[in-house]
Amino acid sequence: MVPSGGWSILGGGRIAQYLAWMLADVGTRVRIVEKNEAKCLTLAEKLPTATISRGDGTDHHLLESEGICHCDAFIALTDRDEENLLMALTAKRYGVKKVVPKMSRLGYLDIVSLTGLDSVVAPKAIVAGQISSYVRGLASSEGRAGESLHYILGGAIE
């Protein structure tokens, strides 16, 4: 059993790796559950203070043995939106106070809002927001840059 507290991350991709590195850097205990053995080995090398567990993060027994009900936050960062949402809801049911699923499909954001989850990570929306902020800065100095980008992206920025 993993000690209580800390953050649990489901999935060991780039976002999870970067988040774990940032959390470990400020002294937060991090545990990552990842299916892929090669990814687990890489994570263990790059994140020596993190606890890396190989297994299926949708397995309730595994999550219980990893102490999900005792963690401060649960972040679901797999490549599957449906899996992220279901496991985030499971973590919420276990009593985790802060639960955040990653949603790649923006169409799912309306569904997430119906679940009672506090937060969601939507990489496409984050990138669009960053681009929009950058273009607003250009538009104020160059005039029409914002209109051009808005047209190119089909109005997806705002």
Positions of PLM-derived features:
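Glycine-rich, N-terminal phosphate-binding loop of Rossmann-like dinucleotide-binding domains
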Residues: L77-T78, M103, K124
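Alpha-helix C-terminal capping segments
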Residues: T90-Y94
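Short loop-to-helix capping motifs
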Residues: D59, R80-D81, R105
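Rossmann-like NAD(P)-binding element
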Residues: C71-E83
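Conserved acidic residues
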Residues: D56
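Short glycine/serine/threonine-rich phosphate/pyrophosphate-binding segments
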Residues: A16-L19, D81-M87
